[in-house]
Structure formats: C-alpha cells, structure tokens
Amino acid sequence: MNLPNGHVLQNGKYRITHVIGQGGFCITYKGVWYTEVKGSLGTVQTEVPICIKEYFFKDYCYREAESFAVKVHSETGRVLFDKFKEKLIKEAKILSEVHHPHIVNVLEVFEENGTAYIAMEYIPGC
C-alpha cells in the first residue's frame, strides 16, 4: 500500500526514503528534496530532508502495483475520496500561509498518481 523507498515524485524533485507513519486518511513519508543553492560565485546541488504526506483514504482506495496510482473501489467511494482530497489541498494552501515556530512549514501541495501530496518541512523527532 505504501510507495516504495526510493520512489520519486514531481519528475525527480522529491524522493521517498521511508514511511514515518500512516493512518486512515494519509501516509507520511520522510524524503529528500533535490534543490540548488545559488551564491554570488556559483551553485551547489543539495538534498534537503523533508516530510511528504500522501492522501490515501484507505477504506475507499487501493494502489495499483505496477503504476503506483491510487484508485478508488467504487463510484460512491470516488465522490467521498474527491471531496476529502479537495479539503486536504485547501488545508495545505491555508497552512502554507501560517508562519510560526511551532507550526511546520509547507513547501507545496501537488497532485500525482491520482491523489494529493503535501511536501513540508521535516522536523526530526516529531
């Protein structure tokens, strides 16, 4: 049901390293963000540890083994799945505007594999 370790998202921008936890609505992964830091004399490629939350409404969906796409069991389930996916996307966008030392920073929200993902700051020990 989880994405495999090493799986890439957003055309290689993010890579899953391992599962941190999962519940009824989401699977949370630790991952890396491939980015670059630019200075006045050059650019350095770097990997930033991040947290990636995948919307996976486990009672209503499953993952295709070959494509890793998230599929819904029924049309009734599709209505519920889509409704909560849109709420998750909206919540991520709102959270991205909140900046506080005790609230995790959101990098972006995106759709891929038939579901939604939130890329956010990784805080060790949480």
PLM regions with names:
Residues M1-I16:
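A short, low-complexity linker immediately N-terminal to eukaryotic Hanks-type protein kinase catalytic domains
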Residues T17-G23, T28:
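Protein kinase glycine-rich loop
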Residues G21, K90, H99-H102, P124:
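Flexible N-lobe loop architecture of eukaryotic-like protein kinase catalytic domains
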Residues G23-F25, E112-T115:
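Short acidic/glycine-enriched loop/turn segments that link adjacent beta-strands
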Residues K30, K38-E75:
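Glycine-rich ATP phosphate-binding loop
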Residues Y62-E97:
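AlphaC helix of the eukaryotic protein kinase fold
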Residues V109:
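Activation-segment/catalytic-loop signature of the eukaryotic protein kinase fold
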Residues N113-C126:
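Conserved short submotifs of the Hanks-type protein kinase catalytic core
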